[in-house]
Structures are given as C-alpha cells and as structure tokens.
C-alpha cells in the first residue's frame, strides 16, 4: 500500500501537525548536539514555505509521564530551532484544547511525554492530537517502532496522515538495501552480543552474500569455529547458534586480531595471529591483515549495510579495524546504508558521513526494520494511504 507523502499535498493555509524526533541532548539549558534538529529542518521549512500553520511535536528524555518537568522541557529546542530558522518558534505548553497559529508560523508543542497516556497510545489523547490538525505528518523514523499516541494513534484519527520527507527518504533507502538490493550484498554486524543481534543476523542471511561480524559477536563465531578467544567477551551458550548461522551464510572470520590484557583506554594493544591468542588475552579489534581482507570484500560489493563497529573504536588503539572499514565503504561505489548509534558515532569520528549513501536516523527502529518487523507508525500510514 502506498503511503501518502507530505511533498504531494497542498499545505497552504492548512493546520499541519508534524511529529519530529527532536530528542536531543541538553546541557545547562542549551542544546549540546543538534543533529536531529538539523535533520528535521528541510521538512519544517517545506511546510512553512508552503504557507502551512506548522505545529511540531516531539518527546525529550524520559520524564515521568503526565507530569511537567522543567528539566525535560522543549524550551531549549524551541530557542535553538528559532535560531536555525531565523524566526521565533513559540513553545506552547497547553495545546490539547486547540491553538491559534498563523500561516507560515512555526510553533513547538511542549514534550508529548508530559501528556498522560502518550506512551500507551491512549485513544482519547490521540483524538485530541488529531483534532488540532488538518494534516498529520509522521517524520520521526527513530520512534516509528513505538506505537504511541503521537506516532501512531494520532495517524488513525487525523483528517489526513502522511510521511514527511525524512521518514520517506529513510524508508526508500532501507527498501533499496533490503527489498531488491544490487548484488553482491555485504553486511557488517558489530556489537557486543550475538543475542541482541540474532534476529538481525537471521534476517540478513536471506539477502547477504557475506556477513562480516565484529566486536563481541565475532568472538562467539571465532569460538564456534574452534579458535581460542582467551578472556574476550564471548557467549559460549550461543556457540551452536553461531555454527548454525555460519552454515547458512558466508561469515569471513578474522585471521589476526588486536588484543590487550585489560579493557581500558590505557591498555597496550598487541597484534596476534588468531591461533596465538592466549588465555589472558582480550580481543578488542580485528588485525591489519583481516581489515585488508574485509576492505577487499567491501570493494567488490554493490550493496553494503553497516550496523556496528568491529572493535572498541572509542579507544584509538582499538579503532583501526573500524576505521579501515569506514574508509573502504567511503571509497566504494556500492549503495551503502549505515545505522545505529555506535555506527553513526564511528562515521562521524572517521569523517566519512558525506561518502555514505544513507545514514539512518533510527536506532531501534532501524534494527526492527532490518529484522523484518512491522513498524506501527509506518503500518498506520499505509492503512491511511488509500
């Protein structure tokens, strides 16, 4: 079913309610990282320039639901957004009974989590949101996996419900990487535990030619292949599961690794052949030979899906593997999609953001989409798309 797009609708003079993900870090009353606000700017500007009465809603932090808490107020976001837009953005605290907004004006509603019933997708609250608008725009992919009143319920009852440009672009990029990808497809799945990425691995094996595993996940696959992993993070109870996955899809394993005797920023890094790992070693990165082999695989790929680093890149001496892969992806002609908090941090650290085809804004939503799960906020837009 086709989802309506905001860009296809006439917004002039309409009350347009946009759910954005403006959940940004705030320090001393100021926004300390505005990536999410900047990501939402094109949507907000498009609605404003079309002459809509623009109303924005988002959550911020994890306040107790139904209780106003100044520490989780959207006030710093309204101020920062006003600076970026070059016009005042009014913060409206009490809006559920209706608000007056001028054509071309942008207002921001106070934190949706201050409303009782938001997280439980309360129907009465959803209907109150819906009554505020002529058109509801869902543009927050990062919250699309949660059925809440501001992401799901409101879309059921609004006169018209559609996807904003940010959400539409996200779904298009994910579809391109997963539905009918150009082959060969190589995925990088990093992270500390196989258990948290099991559904991802099971879903990816159906579309991938190879899956490069990294971090603690790789240690479990190394142990499953009979290699020593010393005192590395490893899920020994999932060794049979790892063997099972490796029997169904090609999982290239490290031939050399970077080890240390402790997990610390000051730890000394030593490169070893995989067969030389001792009982006292912790594997904290892939070695240079492995990084080169993985880079070669990425060079030949037509589609690359990246979720998770292959080493403890936060410590520079264990970041070379992730850096080498980031650079290989940047130099590749493949369609590349990166997603997940740690991955985005690595993309930023190694300065390759402009060389990746698409960087997903969603953490949990990105993973659930890759796993093939239905995202409630997307499903309701499909239902309303007819």
From Swiss-Prot:
The keyword Plastid does not apply. ATP binds at residues 197, 314, 340-343. GO terms for molecular function: ADP binding; ATP binding; phosphoglycerate kinase activity. GO terms for cellular component: cytosol. One of its GO terms (biological process) is glycolytic process. Substrate binds at residues 21-23, 36, 59-62, 113, 146. The keyword ATP-binding applies. HAMAP family: Phosphoglyc_kinase (MF_00145). Monomer. This is Phosphoglycerate kinase. It comes from Marinobacter nauticus (strain ATCC 700491 / DSM 11845 / VT8). The lineage of its organism: Bacteria, Pseudomonadati, Pseudomonadota, Gammaproteobacteria, Pseudomonadales.
């Amino acid at each position: 079913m086709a989802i309506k797009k905001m860009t296809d609708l006439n917004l002039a003079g309409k009350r347009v309610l946009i759910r954005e993900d403006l959940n940004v870090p705030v320090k001393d009353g100021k926004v300390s990282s505005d990536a999410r606000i900047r990501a939402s700017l094109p949507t907000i500007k498009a609605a404003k320039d079309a002459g809509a009465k623009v109303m924005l809603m988002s959550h911020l932090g994890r306040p107790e639901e139904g209780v106003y808490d100044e520490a989780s107020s959207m006030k710093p976001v309204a101020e920062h957004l006003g600076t970026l837009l070059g016009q005042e953005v009014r913060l409206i605290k009490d809006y559920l009974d209706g608000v007056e907004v001028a054509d071309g004006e942008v207002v921001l509603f106070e934190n949706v989590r201050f409303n009782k019933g938001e997280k439980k997708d309360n129907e009465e609250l959803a209907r109150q949101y819906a009554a505020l608008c002529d058109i509801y725009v869902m543009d927050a992919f990062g919250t699309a996996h949660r059925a809440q009143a501001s992401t799901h319920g409101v879309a059921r009852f609004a006169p018209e419900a559609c996807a904003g440009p940010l959400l539409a672009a996200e779904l298009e990029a994910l579809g391109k990487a997963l539905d009918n990808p150009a082959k060969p497809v190589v995925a990088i799945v990093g992270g500390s535990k196989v258990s948290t990425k099991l559904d991802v691995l099971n879903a990816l094996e159906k579309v991938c030619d190879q899956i490069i595993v990294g971090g603690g996940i790789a240690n479990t696959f190394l142990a499953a292949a009979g290699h020593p992993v010393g005192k590395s993070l490893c899920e020994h109870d999932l060794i049979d599961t790892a063997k099972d996955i490796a029997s169904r899809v090609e999982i290239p394993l490290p031939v050399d690794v970077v080890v240390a005797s402790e997990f610390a920023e000051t730890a000394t890094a030593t490169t070893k052949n995989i067969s030389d790992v001792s009982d006292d070693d912790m594997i904290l990165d892939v070695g240079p030979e492995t990084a080169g082999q993985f880079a070669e695989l990425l060079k030949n790929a037509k589609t690359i899906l990246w979720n998770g680093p292959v080493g403890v890149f936060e410590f520079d001496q264990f970041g070379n593997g992730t850096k080498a892969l980031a650079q290989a992806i940047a130099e590749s002609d493949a369609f590349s999609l990166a997603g997940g908090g740690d991955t985005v941090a690595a993309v930023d650290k190694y300065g390759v953001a402009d060389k990746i085809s698409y960087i997903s804004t969603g953490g949990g939503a990105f993973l659930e989409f890759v796993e093939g799960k239905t995202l409630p906020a997307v499903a309701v837009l499909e239902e309303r798309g007819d």
